[in-house]
From Swiss-Prot:
GO CC term (a single one): mitochondrial small ribosomal subunit
Highest classification ranks of the organism: Eukaryota, Viridiplantae, Streptophyta, Embryophyta, Tracheophyta
Name recorded for this polypeptide: Small ribosomal subunit protein uS19c
Coiled coil location: none
Localization (cell): Plastid, Chloroplast
One Gene Ontology molecular-function label: structural constituent of ribosome
Keyword Plastid (UniProt): yes
Family: Belongs to the universal ribosomal protein uS19 family.
Keyword DNA-binding annotated: no
GO BP of this protein: ribosomal small subunit assembly; translation
Organism, scientific name: Glycine max
Origin superkingdom: Eukaryota
Length: 92
């Protein structure tokens, strides 16, 4: 179920403060965040945000096509390494 249009998109306050601060200075530093639930808004375009995936922070460059999505969508948490090989030698 999607979020109601009557409500504003969720963006963590600390993340919003950091982005507004960088926009006023016109700087492009990497912003480190653990807030995967924050929605990408147009003021974030052009910034690089390092999103936590449970183990490390993955730097993601925000483009205009990402607006409206959540930050966590671009930082995968699981690493699928494939199914186990059929090892007949260990069965004997």
């Amino acid at each position: 179920m999607t979020r109601s249009l009557k409500k504003n998109p969720f963006v963590a306050n600390h993340l919003l403060r950091k982005i507004n601060k960088l926009n006023t200075k016109a700087e492009k530093d990497i912003i480190i965040t653990w807030s995967r639930a924050s929605t990408i808004i147009p003021t974030m375009i052009g910034h690089t945000i390092a999103i936590h995936n449970g183990k490390e922070h993955l730097p993601i460059y925000i483009t205009d096509r990402m607006v409206g999505h959540k930050l966590g969508e671009f930082s995968p948490t699981l690493n699928f390494r494939g199914h186990a090989k059929n090892d007949n030698r260990s069965r004997r």
